[in-house]
Amino acid sequence: MLGTISMRFFATKVVAPRASVAASTPQVPLGMNINPYAMFIKENFKANTSDMKRTDLMKELSGKWKALSISEKDKYTELSKNYNAQKLDDFMKLSTEEQKKLVDSAKEKKAERASRRHAKERREKRKQSGRPSVPPSAYALFIKEKLSGAGMESKEKMKEAVAQWKAFTDSQKKKYTDEAKKLKDEYHVVLQKWEAEQKENADQ
């Protein structure tokens, strides 16, 4: 069953207030507002009780949205308008310091998402090129072992694993550092072979 979907998933890009707004109006956080389509998705995600994969459900809901009439979409336009107005009202009631914290936090989260997206793109590019994958670190090996079969409790187990790793002595970490070193050495051998093959192909 699908888990709870964060509001970030439905958020649309929010820019600084328009010039017509009073100069004293602060910048609102990126992603604070959601559009009618996102409101439709949000509502139907909550109503869904199937085991359908999120990507498949999104594809299905996208098709349903396109099939809605203008009058049917008006419902979500109104919901979106009311939601955004309430969010802005709540935001404006905060102190300047609290507003700034929310704006800065939203920017940091956006940067983190962009960083993860770029990292994923690099991994996919490496995979397509046939470049050997960088082996996991000792810490990553430990976390993977601890989270194996974690299921729905993965978040709690992750917290426990992180705390446990931090409390480990060097001797307790040795099993994982030795394995990581072995994998790293093997990686360099395979990488050198791959790079040599790439150079040979380029020279032909």
Swiss-Prot record:
Subcellular location: Mitochondrion; Mitochondrion matrix, Mitochondrion nucleoid; Nucleus; Chromosome, Telomere
GO function term, MF aspect, one: DNA binding
Annotated region (Disordered), positions in chain: 102-138
CDD domains from the UniProt entry: HMG-box_SF
Regions of compositional bias (Basic and acidic residues) in chain numbering: 102-114
Keyword list, A-Z: Chromosome, DNA-binding, Mitochondrion, Mitochondrion nucleoid, Nucleus, Telomere, Transit peptide
Ranges annotated as biased composition (Basic residues): 115-129
Transit peptide, start-end: 1-10
Principal subcellular localization: mitochondrion
Consequence of gene loss (knockout): RNAi-mediated knockdown results in reduced mitochondrial DNA (mtDNA) copy number.
GO biological process: mitochondrial DNA metabolic process; regulation of transcription by RNA polymerase II
Record SUPFAM superfamilies: HMG-box (SSF47095)
Annotated DNA-binding residue span(s): 30-95, 132-195
GO CC aspect terms: chromosome, telomeric region; mitochondrial nucleoid; nucleus
Tissue-level expression: Highly expressed in oocytes (at protein level).
Highest taxon of the lineage: Eukaryota
Function: Binds to mitochondrial DNA (mtDNA) and plays a role in the maintenance of mtDNA levels. May also associate with telomeric DNA, binding to at least two telomeric repeats of the sequence 5'-TTTAGGG-3'.
Assembly and oligomerization: Self-associates.
UniProt-recorded name of the protein: HMG box-containing protein 5
Organism of this sequence: Caenorhabditis elegans
